[in-house]
Amino acid sequence: MATPLQIGGMVNLEERSGSFLPELPYTNRGVIRQKEELSALIDWCQITIKEVPLEAVIEEVLRIPLELMTVTGYEKGIAGHEVVAIFDNIKVLKPTGNAQYQGFQILMSGKGCRNYENFLQLNEETWFDFLNRVCQYHINFPRIDLAIDDRKPYLSVPDLIIRTKEGLLSSKLREIDFHDSGELKEEVFQSKGGSLYLGSSASNLRLVFYEKGYEQNKKYGTELDENWNRYELRFRQEMAVSVVQELLRYRDVAGLAMEVLNSKIRFLEKPTDSMTTRKRLYPTYQAWAELMKDIGKVKLTMQPQKKSLQKVWEWLEKYVAPSLKL
């Protein structure tokens, strides 16, 4: 079987360190830093695929060379599934116990999505190409997340939390949670990583607003980026399926995000007229209105990780280079 990894054009592997890799503007975490104030990512992709053998899931659906995937002796996975193959954070799981069915589950967390974008780029594909291919099979989408990175930022997450506490939020999502860590400086509380959750963790839609720069600083000790917020739209089950269908039909991430946000929530200003008591008559919070206006410019981007790309090059050198005349 020919390798499913198709490299765009002829790449000289011996020259890669002086040409291809340095051209990608990676940060110290192996992530391409976007210059746009607003950008969108697929940040979680979970797919159930039935009646397809493991080798075909890896080589034909994912289009990852089988030699790159580590086939495990069954490791613990999630929700009644065990990991049977893995490449960094790209996982293929098999159902166990009550979850039995003939097939597998592809699981890519945020890091897994960044890992997989290396293969998309090397195959000269986009997420739309991948999702379209996946939908040719007997599949379901337990979950897919869209993330909007705001590097302006348009919003202050601590301010959103305060507005929510003060009732200045109109929301169709009933369950609300928030976390706001920080410190006192001269008796004034300063946020150091706020998060706002709208919708339950088990619902078909959950919206999460948080300070991504603080999260990355705490997790990895990276340089603090105070101007990096992330707004996540987490879709499950029927809504996840509908989202994928909409993405493939219109290829418009911005329009989809705007439609979901506008239909579910609106942050408010206190009305100047004290007689106004109905929230639907409250004016929209100006910063929220500006975000909704500019979110229409958002495009789906890719931020492949250098770490996993290096593993791909090592595989190419071992398995492909001997058969090429370079």
Question: Residue spans of the language-model regions?
Answer:
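Structured, helix-rich domain cores that form ligand/interaction pockets
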Residues: M1-S308, W315-L326
